[in-house]
Amino acid sequence: MSGAIASSPAATLFLAGSSSSSPRRRRSRVSGVWWHLYGGTGLRLHWERRGLVRDGAVVCSASAAGGEDGVAKAKTKSAGSSKAVAVQGSTAKADHVEDSVSSPKYVKPAVAKQNGEVVSRATKSDAPVSKPKVDPSVPASKAEADGNAQAVESKAALDKKEDVGVAEPLEAKADAGGDAGAVSSADDSENKESGPLAGPNVMNVIVVASECSPFCKTGGLGDVVGALPKALARRGHRVMVVIPRYGEYAEAKDLGVRKRYRVAGQDSEVSYFHAFIDGVDFVFLEAPPFRHRHNDIYGGERFDVLKRMILFCKAAVEVPWFAPCGGSIYGDGNLVFIANDWHTALLPVYLKAYYRDNGLMQYTRSVLVIHNIAHQGRGPVDDFATMDLPEHYIDHFRLYDPVGGEHSNVFAAGLKMADRAVTVSHGYLWEIKTMDGGWGLHEIINHNDWKLQGIVNGIDMAEWNPEVDEHLQSDGYANYTFETLDTGKKQCKEALQRQLGLQVRDDVPLIGFIGRLDHQKGVDIIGDAMPWIAGQDVQVVMLGTGRPDLEEMLRRFESEHNDKVRGWVGFSVQLAHRITAGADVLLMPSRFEPCGLNQLYAMAYGTVPVVHAVGGLRDTVAPFDPFADTGLGWTFDRAEANRMIDALGHCLNTYRNYKESWRGLQARGMAQDLSWDHAAELYEDVLVKAKYQW
């Protein structure tokens, strides 16, 4: 993409695909019921892959679409649609075929009741689908008339595939065959009758990130990118995740597509790999700078990291046209990109500078998710020359820092160019508007306040559910629900004590800590409080890796208090699950925490959190009120050892002397709907706002 866009083969296709002036949503009257078509051929094929097409028609209930009862069927008239179906194969119309690569069936978390009431964070989860949102600028008659025009556009786009390098090699067809003919999770059997949960707001969604669990992960960002797309797909959206291919991923098949991009005077060839898992397309971009970085995603010199992210974003913004998934590309109609943190904040910038400023991708929108604003892609102003952007765009990057002076800031430019932005909690949204919490970007954030929304993360209940957790199925551990909490959690606690060589005692409170060993996570606050903690009748298990001095601190604690403290330096997914299940209390003294996931995992497992009331911790852990018998844990208001000791002391007293109150804390924690389903509904609202933003 380093050259002039107007001369590239891609430009021809973009112009052909964006000639219609109306949004990619059509509606026509069929048998007295509204029948909705979205975004051209690609999204329709996605529904066929998920078993939602019968006799050539998209099955959509009237309740989901806001119309009459019943299900409408209509024959496909578009030649483009017919051609696309043919590409995908004769099995595309199968009503339902088991997905050979899907994860274990989603299991609803155990629901606990207290005083006859169920506590749930997601009060809207069972609310009826809202009425469809219609663009008032497009009359119904015009929308119907444009339907034929869109069919021509879709066909033209497919006919152009050879021109833009979207070949159909054997590898791609074999991969698409597995996707198109057999697809999706058990939940689709319900959606087949009722239509997509998103109703008329179904879109093409491309999530772009530098990491994604289980392929590559360094922290919470990887967990979010691994779970949110699946939740959006369950709502009926066609969803793709784009990440670098750091290693050899067995699931990924080579699409046979190659593109070259120039960064800092060097050409890099990017290869496209694809997998279809849990109803989501995963596209992996392979290039020399990404190879063999599986365990060192953000390693290397600052400028080398920047060049990798420039290459990644340049390639990712073109994925809708060059990555055929299930036999069809996503295209630029009815499309929203979701970029994550500074690593992909250049994507909204390239989308605007390369395409929308030139009349292309006019129906494509971008959303930027802020997971941690402390990392911003800062560098000297000279970095701008590496980004291959029009000269006037430098003003979007230039930022003055009272400490470091004038510099280039990637996150700042991304926030300005994105159509919408999301923070991972309401509390964090408030914090980043302040001088202390905004890390130099507070003025930009306040100026763009209208486009920001806070949405608390969910957790992947296929992985973090004590009822089905695979890490609790051996070595003396046990799966459990709220109904079997007394025996199951006790068994996990005893197994953890044995595994780590601690005295097996059910009466002693076991305190856990899981996290990076750095200043943000506040592990040094635990260090300051350790003399007091060691003087209590408790056991402590700490798991993490990070700063060498803090790693040494963990080893020293275990050496000095070998009868009650274990410090595991390193990281083990299995041990993290087992600590979450076996501990009675989870400590999170983070100095700042955009959302936090460990406290959510803990509550789902009946483990009571003690947290510093910042960011998402304040949003998700309501303080215990012994008089009203409400709350989920204990909070403290300053990142200081004495404040943490005070909160932890009250927690331990309740554990020992007020068993009924303790049981209530566990019940309320486990009763919450902490899944991604509610968060996905809120993200969908943001996507809709972006879609209709002009």
UniProtKB/Swiss-Prot annotation:
> What top-tier enzyme class does this entry carry?
transferase
Q: Name one GO biological process term.
A: starch biosynthetic process
The record ties this protein, via HAMAP family, to:
Glycogen_synth
Q: Name the CDD domains on file.
A: GT5_Glycogen_synthase_DULL1-like
According to its record, what are the GO cellular component terms?
Answer: amyloplast; chloroplast
Q: Main subcellular localization, coarse class? A: plastid
The Swiss-Prot or TrEMBL record describes its family as follows:
Belongs to the glycosyltransferase 1 family. Bacterial/plant glycogen synthase subfamily.
Keyword Transport in record: no
Pathway, per Swiss-Prot/TrEMBL? Answer: Glycan biosynthesis; starch biosynthesis
A GO term for molecular function: alpha-1,4-glucan glucosyltransferase (UDP-glucose donor) activity
EC number assigned by the record: 2.4.1.21
Q: Cellular location of this protein? A: Plastid, Amyloplast; Plastid, Chloroplast
Which InterPro entries would you find in this protein's record? GS/SS (IPR011835), Starch_synth_cat_dom (IPR013534)
Which residue stretches belong to region Disordered?
Answer: 93-197
Keyword terms: Amyloplast, Chloroplast, Glycosyltransferase, Plastid, Starch biosynthesis, Transferase, Transit peptide
Q: In which tissues is it expressed?
A: Expressed in leaves and weakly in endosperm and roots.
Q: Where is the composition biased (Basic and acidic residues)?
A: 156-176
Known function: May contribute to the deposition of transient starch in chloroplasts of leaves.
Where does this protein hold ADP-alpha-D-glucose?
A: 217
Return the protein name.
Answer: Soluble starch synthase 2-2, chloroplastic/amyloplastic
* Catalytic reaction(s) noted: [(1->4)-alpha-D-glucosyl](n) + ADP-alpha-D-glucose = [(1->4)-alpha-D-glucosyl](n+1) + ADP + H(+)
- Compositional bias, Low complexity, is annotated for 127-142, 177-186
Matching entries from Pfam families are given as: Glyco_trans_1_4 (PF13692), Glyco_transf_5 (PF08323)
Presequence extent in this chain: 1-15
